[in-house]
């Protein structure tokens, strides 16, 4: 439902999201520190499995690839190939299909995880756990792994298990209402881009790098959970430029 920001702040899910940090790391296993690899680019030698699709997660993988990481995009053959999205966010990545509903597919992914530094995950909460690739499983397969997951509504609260995407979160969290107010006519308006997706994508890349550095310093296996709704709250906290609605000449 369309809400203003005050209504979202009073909603149980809005309150649950407000109680979360933007980046919520959790140590999920023990492992010795693993030294960073040297190379010509900042992330040279970093191996990333990108199990995400559409915008938010793939933007994170693209940012890591742009700084030298070796990123493999893992796609399900059962899901549609979205041409524009892959052209935009697949740059610099390898791509492969892997059907995790089959034993062969699960064995293939397990072998890839065993050689990875980072796994990006945008599956619905608990979906990968049911397939044998939850955070604890990843830490067992690859001690020292960094797991970065994202969802729409956050990791706690009554909507934690719901599916969602940028436009729904914009509407529920008051962004469309605020855009209408800024336009002066009060009619709900979407942001001019999928800002929550793109913003969260860059937070994905930041979190992955931060936790890989932490692993190199103190060891351990790590999981970080992010959400579009928490990114929305962070973007709100940055404030707005009054009178800046429309094109700037």
Segment roles from a protein language model:
Residues 1-78, 106, 110, 114-118, ...:
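Acyl-CoA thioester-binding alpha/beta core of soluble enzymes
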Residues 18-20, 89-92, 163-169:
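Short, hinge-like loop/turn segments at secondary-structure boundaries
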Residues 68, 92-93, 116, 165:
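Short, well-ordered alpha-helix to beta-strand connector turns
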Residues 69, 73-99, 104:
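Glycine-rich phosphate-binding loop and adjoining beta1-alpha1-beta2 segment
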Residues 93-128:
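Rossmann-like NAD(P)-binding element
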Residues 99, 118, 158, 162-165, ...:
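Hydrophobic alpha-helical scaffolding
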Residues 102, 121-174:
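N-terminal Rossmann-like NAD(P) cofactor-binding subdomain of oxidoreductases
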Residues 175-192:
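The feature captures the short pre-catalytic strand/loop hairpin that immediately precedes
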């Amino acid at each position: 439902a369309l809400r203003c920001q005050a209504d979202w702040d009073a909603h149980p899910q809005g309150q649950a999201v407000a109680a979360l940090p933007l980046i919520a790391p959790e140590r999920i296993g023990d492992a010795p520190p693993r030294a960073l690899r040297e190379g010509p680019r900042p992330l040279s030698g970093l191996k990333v499995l990108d199990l995400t699709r559409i915008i938010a997660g793939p933007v994170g993988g693209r940012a890591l690839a742009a700084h030298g990481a070796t990123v493999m995009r893992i796609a399900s053959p059962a899901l549609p190939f979205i041409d524009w999205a892959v052209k935009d966010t697949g740059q610099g990545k390898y791509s492969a299909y892997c059907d995790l509903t089959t034993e062969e597919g699960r064995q293939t992914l397990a072998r890839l995880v065993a050689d990875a530094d980072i796994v990006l995950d945008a599956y619905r909460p608990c979906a990968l756990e049911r397939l044998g690739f939850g955070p604890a499983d990843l830490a067992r397969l690859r001690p020292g792994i960094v797991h970065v997951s994202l969802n729409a509504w956050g990791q706690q609260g009554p909507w934690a298990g719901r599916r969602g995407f940028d436009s729904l979160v914009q509407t529920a969290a008051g962004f469309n209402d605020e855009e209408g107010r800024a336009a002066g006519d009060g009619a709900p308006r979407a942001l001019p881009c999928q800002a929550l997706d793109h913003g969260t994508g860059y937070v994905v890349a930041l979190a992955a790098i931060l936790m890989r550095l932490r692993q190199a310093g103190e060891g351990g296996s790590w999981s970080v959970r992010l959400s579009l709704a928490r990114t929305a709250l962070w973007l709100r906290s940055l404030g707005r430029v009054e009178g800046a609605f429309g094109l700037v000449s």
